[in-house]
Each structure stands twice: as structure tokens, then as C-alpha cells.
Amino acid sequence: MARPKIALIGAGQIGGTLAHLAALKELGDVVLFDIAEGIPEGKALDIAESGPSAKFDARMSGTQSYADIAGADVCIVTAGVARKPGMSRDDLLGINLKVMKSVGEGIAAHAPNAFVICITNPLDAMVWALREFSGLPHEKVCGMAGVLDSARFRHFLADEFDVSMKDVTAFVLGGHGDTMVPLVRYSTVAGIPLPDLVKMGWTTQDKLDAIVQRTRDGGAEIVGLLKTGSAFYAPATSAIEMAESYLKDQKRVLPCAAYVDGAYGLKGFYVGVPTVIGAGGVERVVEISMNKDEQAMFDNSVNAVKGLVAACKGIDDSLS
């Protein structure tokens, strides 16, 4: 039986890391696409030459032609401009919207049956636009954000409590940006909710509040440190976790920017929510109950995403 085919649209820092991780996990053969001649070919060859030492079997190739992604089982989209210090994800809207149009048309023409994961920022608006431009089924197009934001939240919590991050469960709702909603009440250490850990004296509410804010600022913190780019290891690892759940029908419960139509009181809208990802794509949106404060924060985040979607429609009339 043929190995799955994974198309990576964009061969920058995230794209190259995605290719390496996909190879190491032997998820399938990898095609790196980029408009920059030589970059995808060079990275593909470099990773392929690591195969004998890393002991993986996967074909790696690079291309500037969408025709070479034909029949891809998974497409992960990282193409676009990355943030620089002082920029918000929203500042990238106009430039990256044009990129999504080109990518969406390329996927529709050559890989219409693929499961598509978008990483390009501003994430929630870009995954919506990518779905519109591609015309693929909503359950086959989603955005990588919640897995990354939750991973950052879990890392900070594990550091605070000095425990294994394997025992920390946490997830984040809402848009991928300053308005994201890390849910303290639903986050646990070995099954113990964070509010109970405050009562037990393991931490303080002030420290938890600081961790929540650091989670919101997680991407900007790395942009500020790198100065010439944005995060790539953690975003790539998060997207691979989603792709693996799809390819292996693991049915993992993972937060991502998914199409919500009825749940959370939303109608036909992409935003970060817990989902089940399996062979059918986003097979289910998990609707949780929120208290008044959580709902207010989620509504604020949804409104921010709606503003970005409206801006996209203002830029490209075909989206209206």
C-alpha cells in the first residue's frame, strides 16, 4: 500500500521543521512547495540525507509547482509573511490574504480530497479565507492554533508546579491572538483543577493570572527574542500532532480553529474550539459550558475574529 502523501505549502522555518518531523515519525512521503526556487528542493534533500542516520523511510521532494502536490492526503499551509517585532498577527492580513487565494486555488485544483491545516496568521481569518477560496468541505479545513496555545499554557503550568507536563491538561478557546481564552477552570494537574491547587497552596491566583497572560503573549515573546522571525518548532509540532490524528484515525480531542455551525451559539464561523480529529477530518466540535466571565471573554474573542473576517471581505470582493 502506498504511503500517505503530505504536502507542505511554504518551505520556511515552519515548513522545514514540519518536513523533518513528518519524516522522523514516518507519517508519509513529503512534498515541500515554495515559490522561492531552490529552497524547498534544498531542504527536502537535506532532510532526505538525514534518513540513513535517523533511520526513517520517506520520500522527500521540493517543488515550485502545485501539480506536484496532486493526490496529497494532508496539506499543511504555512505560506505567507511572518511577524516581526512590534507587529501583531492582524498586521499581516492584507498580504497573507492574497497568499491564501493562490494556495486555496492550488489545493482545490490538485488536492481536493486533502485534510488541510492552516498555520498562516492571522490564523482564524486565514483559515476561513482558505476554506472559501478552496471550496473544500468545512470539516476538511481547520487551523492550527489551540494545540499550540494549549501547549504553551501546559508548559508554563508544568514549570510553575515543577511537575511533568504529561500530567498537565489545559486548553485554550477563541481566536489565536491577544483575545484567546485560556480556561483555568478546565485545566488540571493529574486531574486536580487549577482553582483547587490554589486552595491547596500550590500556587496563587496572581501567579495563575500571570501565566494566562504569558500564554496570550507567548508568540510575541518569541518574536521579541528572535527579532528576525517567529516561532517554528512548537507550531510545527502542534500541526504534526493534528495531522497524525487524522492520518491514523486517532480521534484525539484537540483544540483548533474549526468551522462552528450551531455550537456555542455561532452560525457558520471559524474559531478556536475543542474538536475530535479523525479520518473524517474535524469529526466533532466539543461544546463545553462556560460561566459568565468565560463566556464574556469568549464573546470578545469571537468579535475580534469577526472583525478580521469583515476586513478580509473588504479587501477581496469575491469573499463577500
From Swiss-Prot:
Native organism taxonomy: Bacteria, Pseudomonadati, Pseudomonadota, Alphaproteobacteria, Rhodobacterales
Single GO molecular function: L-malate dehydrogenase (NAD+) activity
Domain of life: Bacteria
Keywords carried by this UniProt record: NAD, Oxidoreductase, Tricarboxylic acid cycle
Pfam family, any one: Ldh_1_N
Active site: 176
The protein's name in its UniProt record: Malate dehydrogenase
Enzyme Commission identifier(s): 1.1.1.37
Gene that encodes it: mdh
Gene Ontology terms describing biological process: lactate metabolic process; tricarboxylic acid cycle
Cross-referenced CDD domains: LDH-like_MDH (cd01339)
Function: Catalyzes the reversible oxidation of malate to oxaloacetate.
InterPro entries per the UniProt record, alphabetical: L-lactate/malate_DH, Lactate/malate_DH_C, Lactate/malate_DH_N, Lactate_DH/Glyco_Ohase_4_C, Malate_DH_type3, NAD(P)-bd_dom_sf
Residues that, per the record, bind NAD(+): 10-15, 34, 96, 119-121
Species this chain originates from: Roseobacter denitrificans (strain ATCC 33942 / OCh 114) (Erythrobacter sp. (strain OCh 114))
UniProt record similarity statement: Belongs to the LDH/MDH superfamily. MDH type 3 family.
Catalyzed reactions: (S)-malate + NAD(+) = oxaloacetate + NADH + H(+)
Annotated binding of substrate, by residue: 83, 89, 121, 152
